[in-house]
Amino acid sequence: MARVCQVTGKGPMVGNNVSHANNKTKRRFMPNLQYRRIWVESENRWVRLRITAAGLRLIDKNGIDAVLVDLRARGEV
């Protein structure tokens, strides 16, 4: 499974490790992903999502129902 947030769509980014001597080596910045079970009151059931911390804050802000409408429109859930 890809390391992508189901809510925000954020995935890994590519960048550099930079040493004190300014040597650069490639690295990946991984999103802060967690599996979360979120209670959906309108459907009276749990929904399991793989989301980032930013996705959790988005659910707190907009509500799980609005986020689920967007996910279903994209075919994620």
From Swiss-Prot:
The lineage of its organism: Bacteria, Pseudomonadati, Pseudomonadota, Betaproteobacteria, Burkholderiales. Keywords: Ribonucleoprotein, Ribosomal protein. GO terms for molecular function: structural constituent of ribosome. Belongs to the bacterial ribosomal protein bL28 family. One of its GO terms (cellular component) is cytosolic large ribosomal subunit. PANTHER family: 39S RIBOSOMAL PROTEIN L28, MITOCHONDRIAL (PTHR13528), LARGE RIBOSOMAL SUBUNIT PROTEIN BL28M (PTHR13528:SF2). GO terms for biological process: translation. This is Large ribosomal subunit protein bL28. Pfam families: Ribosomal_L28. It comes from Polaromonas naphthalenivorans (strain CJ2). InterPro entries: Ribosomal_bL28, Ribosomal_bL28/bL31-like_sf, Ribosomal_bL28_bact-type, Ribosomal_bL28_sf.
